[in-house]
Amino acid sequence: MKILVAGGGGREHAICLALTKNANVELYSVMGKKNPGIAKIARESFIHAETDVPAVLAFAKEHNIQYAVVGPEAPLEAGLVDALTKAGIGCVGPVKAAARIETDKGFCRGLMNKYGIDGCPAYKLCNTPKEAAEFIREYPGDLAVKPTGLTGGKGVKVMGEQVDREGAVEYAMTLKDQVIILEERLLGEEFTLMAFVDGKHLVPMPLVQDHKRAFEGDVGPNTGGMGSYSLENHKFPFVTEDDYAKAISIMQATIDALAQEGSPYKGILYGQFMNTKTGPKVIEFNARFGDPEAMNVLSILTSDFLTIAEHIINGTLSANDVSFEEKATVCKYIVPMDYPDKPHAGDVITVGPAENTILYYANIALENGVLMTLTSRTMAYVGIGASLAEAEKYAEAACRNVSGNVRYRSDIGTEALFAKRIAHMKELRS
């Protein structure tokens, strides 16, 4: 079975490793920069922009690709799935119209409003920076300020966190030539719920919590994600059964709404939720696996990913097709020392021994047997254990054995940070 994976990050390395557990998979890759982990296991790699739809389509046809899995959001927005599907290649990933759930935040909020879907925060769309600035100045509370398009997870500024009111105004004024969305600031604990979706049915994956801030203690600028964790029971103590059921219901209602709009959703749906005093609210939807969250869930996937992909493509997915090991995971990203502001490329890094972990390469170069940093997140270790403490211990030990001009967040997955999350939610709801 010839499978094409589009994308070359840590998420895509995880997708490729999960697929190739099936000996019948013949893996092909298209990626903008060569990922040495993917290149090692692929039959052939096409080093080319994944958003160049005609070129990717030609590569797929040349190699008689049967199925494709699209990792990042940019090729979804470019219409890669539409082109591959038209050519008879089954895809794990939504068509462009359905991917708007991520690529156009205004569309997402409008869809939730139109169909009365729960969990939508109060929001306002502004067509000019001036309009946004005026609203920010007049609004009595705190707001999240974001462009409606793709920002790589780094486009939001939240009043009371990264900026004050004047800082929010200044940021809004920089967002020229795009629609700006202003949303009420949500207070609570974030969690990620990803699901496999076949157009009608969803099958959830373990809950994951990501850590966007660059530095320990959840401070510093937002990043693409410095690491994440999941628990052995696949839930969180700060997400009640009612909260969880509501989050599932919100995602199912969103899938139903997209089908009603004439754009059935097939692929991975990622719900980023803020669990507030009154229950989960949707921060955003993504139209693909999270990065790093994909590495947590795919590291403990026990069912065959190729079979899941076939059921997604054929519209025959059921809960019986998906199973995960009852293990905890902790993912810690190794990044260039000055990431995300001024990361330096070309620094040599060495990797030491690691136990009970999986290493996923991301934005990294391998030249003459030497690993070197590039300008984004370098690589990630996922520790796997019977408990969060055990998984964190393995991930931490592996990261400590990496040397070079790099850093990581040692607090991700620790008992102290986890206890802080639980206490915060308890205080919020007391």
UniProtKB/Swiss-Prot annotation:
InterPro entries: ATP-grasp, ATP_grasp_subdomain_1, PreATP-grasp_dom_sf, PRibGlycinamid_synth_ATP-grasp, PRibGlycinamide_synth, PRibGlycinamide_synth_C-dom, PRibGlycinamide_synth_C_sf, PRibGlycinamide_synth_CS. Mg(2+) 2 binds at E284, N286. It is an enzyme of class 6 (ligase). ATP binds at residues 136-192. It holds the Pfam family GARS_N. Residues 109-314 form the ATP-grasp domain. Pathway: Purine metabolism; IMP biosynthesis via de novo pathway; N(1)-(5-phospho-D-ribosyl)glycinamide from 5-phospho-alpha-D-ribose 1-diphosphate: step 2/2. It catalyses: 5-phospho-beta-D-ribosylamine + glycine + ATP = N(1)-(5-phospho-beta-D-ribosyl)glycinamide + ADP + phosphate + H(+). Its cofactor is Mg(2+); Mn(2+). This is Phosphoribosylamine--glycine ligase. Mn(2+) 2 binds at E284, N286. One of its GO terms (molecular function) is metal ion binding. Keywords: ATP-binding, Ligase, Magnesium, Manganese, Metal-binding, Nucleotide-binding, Purine biosynthesis. Transmembrane segments: none annotated. GO terms for biological process: 'de novo' IMP biosynthetic process; purine nucleobase biosynthetic process. Mg(2+) 1 binds at Q272, E284. Its EC number is 6.3.4.13. Binds 2 magnesium or manganese ions per subunit. Mn(2+) 1 binds at Q272, E284. Belongs to the GARS family.
